[in-house]
């Protein structure tokens, strides 16, 4: 396949989206189910691995082996408070592997464990394949987005996930920055504009303030809540209906995982309906102990169930304004991002907060981030179209960076919301006489004492010549590149001795070897998935052949054209094969093909004889199946070997 353009991927907590910039505009690409967003879900079963819609659709039947929310684990330590509290809510197992979290599942009858990077890489592989199917070309270059909050280790781990998926990640950019780009292309303005981006997605909430002037973006502040989103609104509705079920039927369904799962799916659907209608009905057959649950919910009730959560979205807005030192009257544009911003009540609260100002909803909120990432991908891969040329992008550091000085004090070198790339240098000295070395400990965070901040890494600068305290001069430099990767160096001015560290959070990082191993495993899993698809297709082919052949010889139009002995021969063989199929659903591809050849050996001579005597058979042309068997009876039945297999799962 020829090489395709660079794509933009919004790797979301609950859903992901991919876009490409071509023919002077961005196209958001639909997956094989026709959806423009794909669930960030990976499921493992006895026979196969599923990614995206297929994984999410079977979650009710296979909750413990269906992994989602990998974005909440990526780049974190197992003992991170976030990981510990999230684990309580997940149906899948998270285990501790030398201080790093891994998800543990049953796959093809074995216990397997995967790093979050691997799970995210599976979702990225899916997004890559979606783009390739649409473009008909191989896709390798991509821009991938992350929340403005992500610290260094989370950004780096996301980049690793891209590498494992076989992508060359051109750049990791902040989601609000991407949304701003999507928006910046639509509105060319000369004067400086302050833009507030309100991003309420499936699992997270981010508010960012940017200024745009002459095509240059600058992020002024970011705020938000990593644990607020559409899923929380679903949960409120789920709890409401669990209580209603208790009242109506005196039964508690909350312990029955499958019932709750089915109820949650229905609630998510109802929530979406309530963004356009004032009421929604829910009908679930045999929800619990054979009881059907038919009920409805109004928009007003939904708003009341979530009143505190909806109102709470304004707190980060106020914080972002404070950090950017702006008054709400100074915001020129408000941009909505994330599916949950479709909720009318949220739009109203935000609009009222900004004294009736119109909101920008022109960009589909689910797609805005991928849209901007696609534009950025085009810029970075050297797209020359003028739509793209006038755009420059400045990203920021989400948290302050500094080192620990005497007494455990955090001394900041790079303040949060500093535009990157950036470089800052400061001179330090020794704390005691004849001190032979200094320990440079690098932290990120906003607290005054380092113990309350996050340690990124540390190194020692030794060999300082003996001198009284305060005499040696040690120059410390913090340098952040465009990808947000941090280099810290320390030089002793008198000797020129230097030591440095690249903070890619190695304790949370995968080693080169790990990544390479995972790339190979990803290839292996992909090959297994292919093999499984081929197997199913040869099984379906055999099944269709047997049933169609049976139907053909039993067709009354053939009465008298085929002698009973031949007919019986075919029927016996077909029934034998159908019985074999029932018992051997999981046989190998070769076995299905062998059975098909055996069946053809019996059928082909008889059918050929029929043709010669009848000069072509009534009612059907030869079907396009291996062995070209005739289609039966009235409607010619073609081979169903490669047709879609549709299964309804609640």
UniProtKB/Swiss-Prot annotation:
Its main location: cytoplasm. This is Heat shock cognate 71 kDa protein. Residues 2-386 are annotated as: Nucleotide-binding domain (NBD). Residues 616-636 have a biased composition (Gly residues). There is a cross-link at residue 512 (Glycyl lysine isopeptide (Lys-Gly) (interchain with G-Cter in SUMO1)). Residues 614-650 are annotated as: Disordered. The modification N6-acetyllysine is found at residues 108, 246, 319, 328, 512, 524, 589, 597, 601. Keywords: Acetylation, ATP-binding, Autophagy, Cell membrane, Chaperone, Cytoplasm, Hydrolase, Isopeptide bond, Lysosome, Membrane, Methylation, mRNA processing, mRNA splicing, Nucleotide-binding, Nucleus, Phosphoprotein, Repressor, Spliceosome, Stress response, Transcription, Transcription regulation, Ubl conjugation. Ubiquitous. The modification Omega-N-methylarginine is found at residue 469. The lineage of its organism: Eukaryota, Metazoa, Chordata, Craniata, Vertebrata. It comes from Bos taurus (Bovine). The keyword DNA-binding does not apply. InterPro entries: ATPase_NBD, Heat_shock_70_CS, HSP70_C_sf, HSP70_peptide-bd_sf, Hsp_70_fam. It catalyses: ATP + H2O = ADP + phosphate + H(+). Its EC number is 3.6.4.10.
